[in-house]
Amino acid sequence: MSNLQTRIITAIVLGTITLWLTWVGGVGFTLFSIAIGLAMFYEWTELSATRQTAFSRLFGWAWLIVTGILLILDRGALLTIGFLVAGCAILLVTQWKSGRGWPAAGLFYAGFSALSLSLLRGDEPFGFTTIVFLFAVVWSTDITAYFNGRALGGPKLAPRFSPNKTWSGAIGGAAAAVAGGLLVASLVAAPGGWGVPVLALLLSIVSQIGDLAESWVKRQFGAKDSGRLLPGHGGVLDRVDGLVAAAALLYLFGAIFAEPDVLSAIFFSF
């Protein structure tokens, strides 16, 4: 079986599980989001092992688990974010000499990713649509950028970070993201206006930046993949880097234009 076939099969299986848990929502999706965050933190600490200490690992795991418990107990977004930021601050101060900002960055990256995904879904009727909108934008970006880049080639997007990504792939991915976002948004709101396409474009751009940033992190530690958990895709970070970056932006957008704990109203503020 070729790497592309393995990649496609893994994507189909993961996509099916993800969409089912998104439909279920509630605690099920929250646990799924926390599992993603925990996997991200594991891979981050393994990648940056030379910047970690026994304390940073133990403290990071404990703080991330408690953050997840706060999410499950639904203690409020601001409290959970505040708790997460406090933990990152402690790591930054206590581990700066040995690890610089790597331990704190890993905790925030994993924790805020889990929090963003969980709160975007929430328990509201349109939480499902909100997450599907995010998936449509990011997956359209990933799939189209991959195949468009391979078919058209052309100038490299950021060869210092990721030698295989091209401008043709990035532009094609962004265009597909706008189309995918418009399709999903049309299910819950009347067509028209500039809000949805602009948001979809921004999410696509941030998704691709998140992908490049994760590639940069791997290069800092001489790694090709973040892990081996996902056949054909490498690690969890390799698969969700763009998704969690876009989720963070969409969460912030919803928190500003709706409210931190109930984000589905984002579709009615354009």
UniProtKB/Swiss-Prot annotation:
Alphabetized Pfam families for the sequence: CTP_transf_1
Gene Ontology CC terms: plasma membrane
Reaction equations catalysed: a 1,2-diacyl-sn-glycero-3-phosphate + CTP + H(+) = a CDP-1,2-diacyl-sn-glycerol + diphosphate
Domain of life assignment: Bacteria
Membrane-traversing stretches: 19-39, 53-73, 76-96, 101-121, 126-146, 183-203, 248-268
Enzyme Commission number(s): 2.7.7.41
Keyword Lipid biosynthesis: yes
Protein's recorded name: Phosphatidate cytidylyltransferase
Enzyme kind, highest EC tier: transferase
PROSITE patterns tied to this protein: CDS
GO molecular function, one term: phosphatidate cytidylyltransferase activity
PANTHER family: PHOSPHATIDATE CYTIDYLYLTRANSFERASE (PTHR46382:SF1)
Source taxonomy: Bacteria, Pseudomonadati, Pseudomonadota, Alphaproteobacteria, Hyphomicrobiales
